[in-house]
């Protein structure tokens, strides 16, 4: 991970946990990061253009209502319920100690920004509009997903204890893949036909200790390529069957973390252990990142022993390629373009603060130059007029694709919050 450099660091007044880091993605493509400490403090990280032409990080505390004194934040999550404007929901779960009775737990849902008055994202306004729901259990992860059809409730029975982490993915709006891990080490995946509301397959395995995270992914780092004639078909990368397959990475607090390959077709039969992941205390988090910018994702895991470990898939196995030491235990990871420069940053939440790590800009420039040379080798460079025609053609094609996608999604395709307990 030598090509990932520390750019900024922000101290927290108190520690967070594995659930207190989330991204906010606006409809214009701008990303922001919302994170919190346990002691009622929530912060927003964003980047602003400065007069000197440089991007400046800005951290501001957001004062959310209905978080009483003495309460602690357990988890948070954010999603946009609209595809054409910034109409966000922010969910925060809290626990309030009560010496006379059982601890009180709540799910606070913040929304109702007046888009007619102020169509731009205003976190401060959203933070003042709260629906507080009294819970009769202690929540863990807060997660949002989509309901594609009104009565789609087919899932295998889960007679286990507390969920630690939950992840859902969809294939072509007709198949739902669900993975979850529990405090007891139980880990389960299921594949559901959402059209017929039937369970196609379900698989279970057991880990020693708690499962700290499950994450579904493809090997290929997908990018929507523009349909420009200046890029010939021979340069367009065609995804292989292995790259299209859905895999799941499972991190464990006591034993080797593992990746199960092609779970839709193979279930949990193809297991690749992440060798060395059990040597650095408990693994608390993971994320998927194209660290070397080769178009394929690598797995980064964070440990309580303050280590970042990066694994790459080569020769049908996941190999430890590099590691990096930080000063405090690592609790959560995000890989998101928060600076708006087209390159994603690695966001690392530790016990003491938030790291923003960036790709080495010199290496990025060299990589871009080499790829442009490969693309335009022995090919005619486009004229300005041709570029304009191609841009208009691409925009028309995107409009047609958007209309097609909207037609394939039913009227019940709205995100909802899901809490793990």
Give the predicted meaning of each segment.
Residues 1-421:
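Beta-propeller-forming repeat regions
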């Amino acid at each position: 991970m030598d090509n990932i450099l520390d750019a900024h660091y922000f101290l927290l007044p108190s520690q967070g946990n594995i659930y207190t880091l989330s991204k906010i993605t606006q409809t214009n493509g701008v990303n922001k990061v919302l994170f919190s400490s346990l002691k009622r403090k929530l912060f927003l990280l964003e980047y602003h253009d400065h007069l000197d032409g440089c991007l400046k990080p800005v951290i501001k505390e957001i004062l959310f209502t209905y978080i009483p004194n003495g309460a602690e934040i357990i988890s948070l999550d954010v999603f946009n319920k609209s595809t054409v404007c910034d109409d966000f929901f922010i969910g925060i779960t809290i626990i309030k100690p009560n010496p006379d009775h059982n601890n009180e737990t709540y799910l606070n849902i913040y929304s109702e920004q007046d888009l007619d008055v102020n169509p731009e994202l205003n976190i401060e306004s959203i933070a003042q509009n709260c629906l507080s729901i009294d819970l009769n259990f202690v929540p863990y992860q807060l997660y949002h997903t989509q309901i594609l059809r009104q009565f789609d409730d087919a899932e295998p029975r889960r007679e286990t204890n507390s969920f630690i982490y939950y992840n859902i993915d969809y294939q072509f709006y007709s198949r739902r893949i669900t993975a979850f891990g529990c405090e007891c080490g139980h880990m389960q995946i299921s594949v559901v036909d959402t059209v017929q509301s039937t369970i196609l397959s379900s698989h279970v395995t057991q880990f020693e200790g708690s499962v700290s995270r499950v994450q579904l992914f493809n090997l290929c780092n997908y990018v929507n390529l523009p349909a420009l004639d200046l890029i010939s078909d021979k340069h367009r990368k065609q995804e292989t069957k292995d790259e299209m397959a859905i895999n799941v990475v499972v991190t464990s607090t006591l034993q080797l973390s593992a990746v199960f390959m092609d779970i839709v077709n193979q279930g949990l039969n193809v297991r690749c252990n992440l060798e060395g992941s059990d040597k650095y205390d408990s693994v608390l988090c993971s994320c998927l990142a194209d660290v070397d910018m080769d178009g394929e994702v690598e797995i980064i895991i964070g440990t309580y022993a303050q280590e970042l470990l990066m694994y790459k898939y080569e020769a049908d196995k996941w190999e430890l390629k590099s590691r990096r030491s930080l000063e405090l235990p690592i609790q959560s990871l995000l890989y998101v373009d928060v600076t708006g420069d087209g390159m994603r940053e690695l966001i690392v939440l530790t016990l003491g603060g938030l790291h923003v790590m960036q790709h080495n800009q010199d290496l990025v420039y060299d990589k871009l130059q080499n790829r442009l040379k490969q693309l335009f080798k022995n090919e005619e460079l486009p004229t300005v007029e041709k570029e304009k025609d191609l841009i208009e053609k691409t925009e028309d094609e995107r409009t047609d694709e958007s209309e097609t996608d909207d037609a394939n999604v039913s009227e019940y395709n709205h995100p909802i919050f899901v809490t793990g307990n």
